[in-house]
A protein has these predicted regions:
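P-loop/Walker-type NTP enzyme "switch/lid" segment
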Residues: 41-144, 285-292
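Short, hinge-like loop/turn segments at secondary-structure boundaries
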Residues: 52-56, 194-195, 224-227, 293-295
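Conserved GTP-binding G-domain of TRAFAC-class P-loop NTPases and closely related GTPase folds
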Residues: 259-260, 275, 280-312
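Short amphipathic alpha-helical segment that frequently serves as the phosphate-/nucleotide-binding helix
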Residues: 17-22, 185, 189, 303
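Hydrophobic/aromatic beta-strand patches that form the interior of the parallel beta-sheet core
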Residues: 5, 37, 107-109, 173-175, ...
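Conserved catalytic-core segment of NTP-binding enzymes
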Residues: 29, 134-275
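Walker A/P-loop phosphate-binding motif and the immediately C-terminal alpha-helix
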Residues: 2-42
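Short, ordered loop/turn segments at secondary-structure junctions
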Residues: 39-42, 113, 158, 179-180, ...
Length: 313
């Protein structure tokens, strides 16, 4: 059965684009036909990730009669030939190694990053906006019918803005991505109550994805020594030496002891299940192409987390 999955969050910088891209690539690597859409209309990024210029942008599709075939770019072969090239440099014996090649298909649809194009959509009159919403629905239908997409993966703009909400309207599954900060949590409560609930009532499924949680850069510790924790009571992370990972870990443990299981409490309050806890892997932030982690580093724990996430969907 085909599915349309959207990554959204209240606050920016929660990892939506990274997770969307890696999920799409991993699904394509597994042999599925995948369409990845940059519907972060206000601040697109996939044109930078994929370094491609489409014949037509998603903006053209939404506001005019641009053809879907001119919007979607087939990037499967460019990944596979890049991969073969890297393999051949690494070892002549392994030329053509197929391990991390994409065996399915991957297309991307890009949003136009030019200010005037973003502005044009933002300030469009009601009729144009109404037509664009119809085209949004049509976009999904075309990808399912003409491209025979098994999965449509959608990256969205954060927050409660016109195009973020409309991007969610085409999704069957909403992945509400958040970090473990009060701002993210309070924000998620707001969008859940004001927006997601309405989509859930209309039949979409929603899940919480906690991203960049402790457990890798900062090891996760269970509270084994209460006395040790009481010694650091009253301190803040900012007062601690920056490289003192052990004390940050203790502070996190203490924080947990104060409010034992708030990720689950949020989930219970909202009636939205948690689908994933993805640790913060600071090493992937140093990669120049973090959106390709699952392709380049198939044994990285981040790749396993993305596998788990897509298996759970
Ligand atoms: N699990 C993770 N571990 C470490 N770094 C991560 C993880 N997930 C995402 N990041 C990093 O966090 C940063 C923000 O990610 P990303 O751009 O995907 O967020 P976003 O939600 O799309 O942001 P925006 O709302 O601005 O579009 C990037 O540098 C990315 O590499
Ligand atoms: Mg993004």
């Amino acid at each position: 059965m085909n599915k349309c999955i959207a990554f959204h969050s209240y606050k920016g910088g929660t990892g939506k684009s990274t997770l969307a891209c890696n999920s799409a690539i991993l699904l394509a690597r597994k042999g599925y036909r995948v369409c990845l859409l940059d519907l972060d209309i206000y601040a697109p990024s996939f044109h930078l990730y994929f370094s491609k210029e489409p014949r037509k942008w998603i903006n053209d599709f939404l506001t005019s009669s641009a053809n879907i075939q001119d919007v979607m770019i087939d990037v499967t072969d460019s990944f596979n030939s890049q991969q073969r090239h890297t393999d051949s440099i690494k070892s002549n014996d392994h030329v053509g190694e197929k391990e991390v090649e994409i065996s399915g298909k991957l297309w991307v649809g890009l949003s136009n990053p030019q200010k005037k194009e973003i502005f044009k959509l933002e300030t469009a009159d009601t009729n144009t906006k109404r037509q664009a919403i119809r085209r949004f629905i049509h976009l999904r239908e075309l990808l399912m019918s003409d491209f025979k997409a098994d999965y449509i993966i959608v990256d969205t703009s954060p927050g409660i803005r016109f195009w973020s909400i409309n991007s969610l309207a085409i999704a069957d599954i909403l992945l509400l991505t958040l970090k473990m900060s009060d701002l993210d949590i309070d924000g998620t409560r707001i969008v859940a109550e004001e927006i997601y609930r309405c989509f859930i009532e209309l039949g979409s499924k929603a899940y919480l994805v906690y991203n960049m949680v402790e457990g890798y850069c900062v090891p996760r510790q269970t509270i084994s020594n209460k006395e040790e924790i009481s010694n650091i009571s009253g301190s803040t992370i900012a007062q601690k030496p920056r490289n003192d990972i052990a004390s940050v870990t203790q502070l996190l443990s203490q924080q947990r002891s104060d409010d034992d299981d708030w990720p689950s409490s949020l989930s219970t309050d909202l009636g939205i299940e948690i689908i994933s806890f993805i640790p913060c892997y600071c090493d992937i932030q140093f990669l120049r192409k973090e959106f390709l982690t699952v392709l380049k580093y198939k044994d990285h724990p981040f790749t396993f987390q993305i596998e788990k996430l897509i298996d759970a969907l």
